């Protein structure tokens, strides 16, 4: 069986646009008739996904897999680091948690993970025509190069040609690219097949003199100037920007609490795309105002974030709003916080054994343990005003919650899930708005409460919208890149598969 060709996208910094460029290449190669898989040896992210077989992986490679038209597979991201504090992360290998590690401890052991990385990569390479590899941060972080397993270190392991991308939108792109190339070793520079200027706004002719000088100084071709593409695609590099965004004023106001360790806030992208729903993230009591719905999202550290809510006054503000009738929704860690008590007897969640009082809005008790619950599932909401809404989603949580009240939904296997009391709703299901049914029922409920007519506010199904956006991304990137040069860098010509 022949082994796949590969191309690797590295960047001059975090946020250079590697994730979306890889998604675009996945889509382009798939459009050209190739079997494609994305790959990132090590990802650091708060937003994760659970595969069909119950393995946890980074969402960036999930998006790239969707762009390629294939099912997400944990082999696409064998190592995932989920920060739980400023100095430590949960280390997930091949979809399963290995435990919490400090940065220093992880750096000392990470080279021992090379066999896991190569096994995952080689397995994918045996099943596909092209592997699109994403780097992390910058390959020129000279303090990290000795034990690199995600940039040039990985490129050497799998013999990958490299495209180096720089972000012109933040300025200094020529210095970014030239400086990065100069800091690389000779054998590393030899792997670079082309430079990409990413996120350009304006007339590309203005860049021509700079491009010529860059090529002269680096002895590398510029294989594309990619415009700033306004596509609505979940992008790891821009997720933090989403938290800062001030959405256009819309008839309905949804306030999501921006917890210090917020995770999987990708759950709420479908709400942002609804014409009637204005979504904003709030950190302070004075920002909360009088929203039509308050959401407590998932978190990587429920206990610490509950303390933060309490100490900063947001807990009291949410309780006042709830008492006045404002609906409140909690997802995963947010659901746990809404209960009466949270117990961490072994300190698995918070580092030290403790028990905290919850917000007391739901009749539940959560006990944290060592075993993480990872599963994909389908469900049907059983409670008004959302009864009948069909959901698909996934669960990622270590806590077990005892419910002394009505369930939010019934899972496909008949198990009750979540909890409801009055206008307070809690669920462990991530991705609950992706099908659109719950979004529509939620919108109708909020419109009725506010006396708004929802007629005419049609929502494109999420999957249809996602595919449209992937095609827009691929069209824009294909037009900007020298695709024959990229195929040549892989030792291919377009059409080799026919």
Cite the ranges covered by each PLM segment:
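Catalytic nucleophile serine of serine hydrolases
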Residues: 332
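Extracellular/periplasmic helix-exit of transmembrane alpha-helices
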Residues: 339, 343-347, 351
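Flexible phosphate-sensing "switch/lid" loops adjacent to ATP/NTP-binding sites
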Residues: 1-322, 327, 344-347, 370-371, ...
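Conserved P-loop NTPase catalytic core
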Residues: 348-375, 381
């Amino acid at each position: 069986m022949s082994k796949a060709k590969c191309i690797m996208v590295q960047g001059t910094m975090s946020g250079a646009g590697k994730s979306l460029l890889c998604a675009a290449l996945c889509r382009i190669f798939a459009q050209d008739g190739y079997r494609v898989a994305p790959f990132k040896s090590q990802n650091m992210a708060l937003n994760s996904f659970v595969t069909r077989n119950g393995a946890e992986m980074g969402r960036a490679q999930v998006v790239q897999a969707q762009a390629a038209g294939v099912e997400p597979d944990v082999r696409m991201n064998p190592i995932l680091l989920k920060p739980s504090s400023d100095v430590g992360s949960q280390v997930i290998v091949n979809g399963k948690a290995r435990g919490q590690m400090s940065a220093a401890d992880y750096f000392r052991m990470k080279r021992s993970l090379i066999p896991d990385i190569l096994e995952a990569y080689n397995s994918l390479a045996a099943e596909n025509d092209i592997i699109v590899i994403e780097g992390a941060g910058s390959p020129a972080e000279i303090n990290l190069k000795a034990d690199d397993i995600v940039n040039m270190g990985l490129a050497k392991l799998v013999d990958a040609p490299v495209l180096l991308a720089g972000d012109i939108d933040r300025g200094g792109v020529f210095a970014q690219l030239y400086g990065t190339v100069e800091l690389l070793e000779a054998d590393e520079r030899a792997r670079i097949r082309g430079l990409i200027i990413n996120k350009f706004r304006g007339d590309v002719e203005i860049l021509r003199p700079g491009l010529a000088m860059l090529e002269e100084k680096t002895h590398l071709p510029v294989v594309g100037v990619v415009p700033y593409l306004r596509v609505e695609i979940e992008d790891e590099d821009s997720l933090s920007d989403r938290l800062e965004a001030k959405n256009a004023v819309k008839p309905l106001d949804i306030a999501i609490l921006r917890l210090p360790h917020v995770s999987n806030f990708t759950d709420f992208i479908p709400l942002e795309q609804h014409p009637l729903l204005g979504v904003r993230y709030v950190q302070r009591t004075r920002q909360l105002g009088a929203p039509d719905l308050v959401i407590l999202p998932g978190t990587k550290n429920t206990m610490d974030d509950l303390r933060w809510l309490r100490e900063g006054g947001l807990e009291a503000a949410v309780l006042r709003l709830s008492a006045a009738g404002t609906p409140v929704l909690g997802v995963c860690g947010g659901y746990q916080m809404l209960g009466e008590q949270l117990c961490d007897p072994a300190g698995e969640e918070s580092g030290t054994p403790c028990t905290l009082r919850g917000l007391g809005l739901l009749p539940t008790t959560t006990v944290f343990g060592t075993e993480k619950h990872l599963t994909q599932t389908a469900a049907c909401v059983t409670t008004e005003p959302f009864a009948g809404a069909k959901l698909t989603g996934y669960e990622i949580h270590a806590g077990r919650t005892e419910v002394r009240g009505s369930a939010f939904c019934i899972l496909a296997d008949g198990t009750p899930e979540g909890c409801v009391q009055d206008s307070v709703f809690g669920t462990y299901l991530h991705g609950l708005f992706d099908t659109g049914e719950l979004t529509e029922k939620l919108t109708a409920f909020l419109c009725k409460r506010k006396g708004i007519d929802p007629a005419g506010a049609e929502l494109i199904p999420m999957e249809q919208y996602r595919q449209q956006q992937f095609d827009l991304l691929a069209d824009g990137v294909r037009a900007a890149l020298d695709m024959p040069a990229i195929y040549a860098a892989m030792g291919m010509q377009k059409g080799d598969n026919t």
